[in-house]
Amino acid sequence: MRTLWITAVLLVGVEGHLLQFRKMIKKMTGKEPIVSYAFYGCYCGKGGRGKPKDATDRCCFVHDCCYGKVTGCDPKWDYYTYSSENGDIVCEGDNPCTKEVCECDKAAAICFRDNLKTYKKRYMTFPDIFCTDPTEKC
């Protein structure tokens, strides 16, 4: 519980991209991201290893891979701009790097939404010591 509280405090205090990603997830899924996704499966949250546990965890795996392709900015901290039109997220701005980060986040938020029916509470706070399968490549 303490880790969850610390994560919540850190994310609320961030003015850059992590707070934006949180808002995007909330908009697309209706779920509170810190509670529902920060420690989900083997790939949601910090780091990642092993094989994704389900479709939601795979969203995080793909998101990590997407971040791995971004060059020229810091995907976790650089600020980007986006708007929401008719329920769709539109990434904006002139900076190609931060726009790419926004597109990674948008794809993950949509993936979470599209997999809400298979979301499993048992993976909400899944201990990574159980992520022992060979790690997949992007």
UniProtKB/Swiss-Prot annotation:
One of its GO terms (molecular function) is calcium-dependent phospholipase A2 activity. One of its GO terms (biological process) is arachidonate secretion. GO terms for cellular component: extracellular region. It catalyses: a 1,2-diacyl-sn-glycero-3-phosphocholine + H2O = a 1-acyl-sn-glycero-3-phosphocholine + a fatty acid + H(+). It comes from the Eukaryota. Pfam families: Phospholip_A2_1. It is an enzyme of class 3 (hydrolase). Its cofactor is Ca(2+). Residues 1-16 form the signal peptide. Keywords: Calcium, Disulfide bond, Hydrolase, Lipid degradation, Lipid metabolism, Metal-binding, Secreted, Signal, Toxin. SMART domains: PA2c. Transmembrane segments: none annotated. Disulfide bonds join C42-C131, C44-C60, C59-C111, C65-C138, C66-C104, C73-C97, C91-C102. InterPro entries: PLipase_A2, PLipase_A2_Asp_AS, PLipase_A2_dom, PLipase_A2_dom_sf, PLipase_A2_His_AS. The active site is at H63, D105. It is found in: Secreted. Binds 1 Ca(2+) ion. Ca(2+) binds at Y43, G45, G47, D64. Belongs to the phospholipase A2 family. Group II subfamily. D49 sub-subfamily. PLA2 catalyzes the calcium-dependent hydrolysis of the 2-acyl groups in 3-sn-phosphoglycerides. This is Basic phospholipase A2 PLA-B'.
